[in-house]
Amino acid sequence: KSAFGQELQEVVHKIYNFRNPDGWKYQIRNAIALNFDTEYHKTLGTNKSNNLDGNFKSKLRLGTIFNEATIGFLGRIGFKELQPIHNSIAFNTHLNNGNTPFVRGVESFLYYETSLAYVAYDATIQGSLFNNNSPITFKPNTIRFNAEIGYKFTAKKWVFGYAYHFHSNKLNNLRNNRGNDYGQLFFSYLFR
């Protein structure tokens, strides 16, 4: 209720002339949320012209919302020389200015990313860690697979990209057991 999800969904349904959403009485109840996330990335290798690389990615999330560990791979094929991972839009680390030794270089690359996650707890499905007063909760799938393929480009302060995403189901026995897939198109501008 505190996130105003019901109100937002009702506005969207009204704009697109969809039927009124139902079922909000069954939503997961409000709870205190505190999570700690940490990530580790390592370049596994690059070619001589530095326009092709492979990177190991890992992430650990602990807290009252998510408890999960993820490992994955990100490969990039650059149309020009790739930026290192500590200065690349692939890792959202291109926020540099004149006070850093790094420059905001032009990047243009295709990428493929896969990950496998072990999920110990997901409050968005299971409800709060501290109380069990949500009317409907489920046990999540403990293993989740994600894949993404796309293109990213940046020049000066502009970032553009598009991607195709696939996520395996978070639950078993859904009407659609084939996972979720969708496209993404994004633009951004860095003010600093």
Where are the regions that the model predicts?
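A general structural signal for well-ordered alpha-helical packing
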Residues: 55-57, 70-74, 107-113
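Conserved mixed alpha/beta catalytic, RNA-binding, or beta-rich assembly cores of soluble enzyme
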Residues: 64-88
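Residue-level signature of outer-membrane beta-barrel architecture
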Residues: 38-44, 60-62, 75-77, 153-155, ...
